Curated annotation (Swiss-Prot):
It is a multi-pass membrane protein. NCBIfam families: PRK11427.1 (NF008510). It is found in: Cell inner membrane. Could be part of a tripartite efflux system composed of MdtN, MdtO and MdtP. GO terms for biological process: response to antibiotic. Its main location: membrane. The gene is mdtO. The keyword Ribonucleoprotein does not apply. It comes from the Bacteria. This is Multidrug resistance protein MdtO. GO terms for cellular component: plasma membrane. The chain crosses the membrane at residues 43-63, 75-95, 100-120, 125-145, 155-175, 399-419, 423-443, 454-474, 480-500.
Length: 680
């Protein structure tokens, strides 16, 4: 701690960020690291033994191909095979018609690159077209002999396909890491966290982590549906299980048992609830659908309401009473292309900008006859992202990974290479480098590309097309400079040529999240099966919506073409909306425990006041006309007297509404007026 206290605050924050990113714990990460590590060592052994060129390309195939589970790895392997066929076919067409004519070659290669970038952004299988765009764009200009060009192109088939076969053998056939196993482990981990917060007074986890865990469960559910027949047969029950576990995990994260009176009835009820959650854990671990015969007694229902756990209890019991053979709801098949693929000009502009950046880099390195920096063209394709903020993020990751890889390559060449005599020693030295790269590459999606870029840059500088000791430091310099040049050119193009800013999209994204929250408020607050299932599904959608808004805020913060004050004001308001939206969701959860005691006819009217106010606020976000909602709670007749607990909970919701930012003000100021009907 003393060492950290002596560091500047930005450095401490950076170290904390990387610690959070790189220490991610998720099911399947350790097997993925081992598969990637062993695969890299086998690629080096095979390439050095049979003198196969372009070893860096083979390593890149592994890093992009080996995924967190066997099904995903198999799916990506199929895409790589298709991409290799398309890529080699397009290259041969370019050679056949335009090898001796550089201008014609550019005229043909340009539309191919544009088409790939357009489809990468608009098609579901965008990874295929990304691979076609990134492969072999510079080979025709790098060599003067047609026969050598053809041979190297044929080598590309081997370079692309044998790592694909290798990762299929390792990750799919020999040591498969099944999605169903990861799902069982993830569900049990989430329930462990929930029980800990139920029984002990713990600090709540960050909401961003809760949302990411919820999204991870949804992704695993998709893989389980595609990979496991038993899961598909009982998919309705398992999807309800995932939704229930997500709800219990996210709700109990903010639960503090010390804030309620510890009567004997409440203590016994919590123990009973924890016991039922443990039974669910055991059933999930065995891959069985959990069934429960527990019914709430009158005393348990009172205790559950007193400690604000009745809704969680009812949700859990409905899962335990659900028929495992309930037929699933048919899922709608998503379209292959985005809806506005041929009407939105941003997609074609995106392709044109990428082509323009590549042409500038091609003209530069061809004009100065400096073929070693051809990585600048690859950089233009790799960092091409839909908007300015995400492009800058990718540029930082690529530059950071390239810098680390270049430093490792320099140290390796100067300090280690002179002492190596055989392939065994080489593999022993490369093992920790590849293990480090695999560990980083399997971390959070926001920073994983650093590991891939580090290993590829290291291989380009030390292992590319050499099958013995090499001491050429020029390669290290050229690869690093090529990446820097490509990054600078791309930054200039994406900033000043049709910049796709998310500053206007962010308020619309926030409005969508708040609109979803208003739908939650319109669901009748009754312990009825259909209402609860709808409520849980929309809640999961809210986790995804708030997480997407949070990530968009981070990207907008990088858009330096915007006015600094306007950007800071937009981000501050947006983060306030996200924070208040999360608080409103949890506060509304608390009202479910008391609202069911109201008359059914009265409930929708009261809930409708909140939903209407939130929808009105969301509608004004796009035009910056939203003001903090002021809600007046209607008086209830004596015959329909509202419970004191519910009144206090709804007053708290009113206070949260009043703290939503006023977008018409010139600067973000805290709300000065208290919401009507609210109490401090």
């Amino acid at each position: 701690m003393s060492a950290l206290n002596s560091l500047p605050l930005p450095v401490v924050r950076l170290l904390a960020f990387f610690h959070e990113e790189l220490s991610e714990r998720r099911p399947g990460r350790v097997p993925q690291i081992v598969q990637l590590w062993v695969g890299c060592l086998l690629v080096i052994l095979i390439s050095m033994t049979f003198e196969i060129p372009f070893v860096a390309l083979s390593l890149a195939v592994l890093f992009y191909g080996i995924q967190s589970n066997a099904f995903y790895t198999k799916f990506v392997a199929i895409l790589f095979v298709v991409a290799t066929v398309l890529e080699i076919g397009s290259l041969f067409l370019i050679y056949k018609w335009s090898y001796g004519e550089p201008l014609i070659r550019l005229i043909i290669a340009g539309p191919i690159l544009m088409g790939c970038m357009f489809l990468m952004r608009t098609h579901r299988l965008g990874l295929v077209f990304f691979a076609v765009a990134i492969y072999g764009q510079t080979f025709p200009a790098m060599l003067d002999y047609p026969e050598v060009v053809v041979r190297l192109t044929l080598w590309c088939i081997v370079v692309g396909l044998y790592p694909t076969l290798l990762m299929t053998l390792i990750g799919v056939l020999w040591f498969p890491n099944r999605a169903i196993t990861q799902m069982h482990q993830a569900l049990n981990d989430r329930l462990d966290d929930a029980i800990s917060h139920l029984t002990d007074s713990l600090a709540p986890l960050p909401e961003t982590r809760i949302e990411r865990e919820a999204l991870a469960l949804q992704k695993l559910n998709v893989f389980c549906l595609a990979d496991d027949a038993n899961w598909r047969t009982q998919s309705a029950w398992w999807q309800s299980c995932v939704a229930t576990v997500t709800y219990i995990y996210s709700t109990l994260n903010r639960y503090d048992p010390t804030s309620f009176a510890d009567s004997q009835a409440i203590i016994e009820f919590r123990q009973k609830l924890a016991s039922e959650i443990n039974k669910l854990q055991h059933a999930v671990a065995e891959g069985q659908c959990w069934q429960s015969d527990w019914r709430l007694s009158e005393s348990e229902a009172v205790a559950a309401r007193e400690c604000n756990l009745e809704n969680i209890c009812q949700t859990l019991l409905q899962l335990g009473q659900m028929n495992p053979n309930t037929p699933p709801t048919p899922a709608a098949k998503p379209p292959s292309m985005v809806a506005d693929a041929f009407t939105n000009p941003d997609y074609i502009r995106y392709a044109v900008k990428t082509l323009l950046a590549c042409l500038i880099c091609y003209t530069f390195y061809s004009g100065v006859d400096w073929e070693g920096i051809h990585t600048c063209m690859l950089t233009c394709v790799i960092v091409a992202n839909p908007n300015v903020g995400s492009s800058y993020q990718k540029m930082v990751l690529r530059f950071g990974g390239a810098f680390c890889g270049a430093i490792l390559a320099l140290l390796f060449t100067l300090l280690v290479m002179p002492w190596l005599d055989n392939i065994v020693e080489l593999l022993f030295v490369l093992a920790p480098i590849f293990l480090l790269g695999a560990w980083i590459a399997t971390s959070s999606e926001r920073s994983s590309y650093i590991g891939t870029q580090m290993v590829v840059t290291f291989a380009l500088a030390t292992l590319e097309n050499v099958f013995g000791p090499v001491y050429d430091l020029v390669e290290i310099r050229d690869r690093a400079l090529g990446i820097i040049i490509g990054t600078v050119v791309s930054a200039m193009i994406y900033t000043f040529v049709w910049p796709e800013s998310e500053a206007r999209t962010l308020p619309q994204k926030l409005a969508g999240a708040l609109g979803m929250l208003s739908k939650v408020m319109r669901i009748p607050r009754q312990q009825e099966v259909t209402a609860l299932r709808t409520y849980l599904q929309i809640r999961i959608g809210l986790h995804a919506a708030f997480n997407a808004c949070e990530e968009m805020c981070q990207r907008v913060a990088l858009e330096r073409q915007l006015d600094s004050e306007e950007r800071a004001l937009l981000i501050e308001r947006s983060q306030t909306v996200i924070r208040q939206g999360r608080d409103i969701l949890h506060a509304w959860d608390a009202t479910w425990n008391s609202a069911q005691a109201l008359d059914n006819a009265l409930q929708p009217d009261r809930a409708g006041q909140f939903a209407d106010a939130l929808e009105k606020y969301a509608a004004g976000l796009a035009t910056a006309l939203s003001r903090s909602p002021q809600i007046t709670l209607e008086e209830t007749p004596t015959s329909q007297a509202i419970l004191p607990t519910l009144l206090k909970q709804e007053q708290h919701v009113c206070q949260l509404f009043a703290r939503l930012p006023d977008w018409t003000a010139p600067a973000l100021t805290p709300a000065t007026e208290q919401a009507q009907g609210a109490t401090q």
